[in-house]
Amino acid sequence: MLILKYLILGIIQGFTEPLPISSSGHLRIFKSLFNSEVLSDMNFEIIVNFGSLIAILILYRKEIASIIKDFFMFIKTKEKKYSVNYKYAWLIVVGTIPAALLGLFVKDFIEEYFTTKLVGLMLIVTSILLFMIKDIKGKKEKKDMTYLDALKIGLFQVVALLPGISRSGATVVGGMKSNLTRETALNYSFMLYIPISVASMVLGVKDLITAGNIATLAIPYLISMIAAGIVTYYAAKLFIDIMKKGKLIYFSIYCFIVGLVVFIIF
């Protein structure tokens, strides 16, 4: 029964993490509905996020390898053909800074004082944000992005520290509002996920190592991580496909319905 519970929650995390529907909001809702001790386990969050991170790294492995290679090649040669990815690497850094700095200060406050009713309200906000960009196409490609664009998108990511505000949704909205193409906005959103996820994992690894239950829960943790990774991979591909078709309205409707129900119930 315990393994099944971890498996189900791993699947939920994996499905909601890359989609613009807020994984943190959904986990908070399930915690309120079922009062599960699993959802109060910070080690669980670290483990399943690691599974999701691995999935995104695999999905974008060619893009990531190209960015890293071109970054160092530009430093070495200064050749123009490497300059786009060199700049893009710095754009990722700039976009990460706002959430990385503010996250350290507000994380504990949010965990303690953010109610499930507020999660419902934030899901409605996510719905409105997604609705606002449903018809926007944008013109700017990766090579056209500016540091101001990166900063603006990074500030949208700060808002997503609130449970119920989707990180991927907020950053895609920020990108689309900066006139990026759908593909460019989505790719940059996933690139921003990587350093934020790594930082969160590093901050929590000490607690994971010193946890008294790590040995007894090793198998449930492993199962939830694998489940989260596999489902994240295919959910991310689904998001990419839906973005290409310009069908963000589906996610907007979903977030509005779930948010309204949660707001009324709690």
Set out the residue ranges of the language-model regions.
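Multi-pass membrane proteins that catalyze or facilitate reactions on polyprenyl-/lipid-phosphate substrates
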Residues: M1-F266
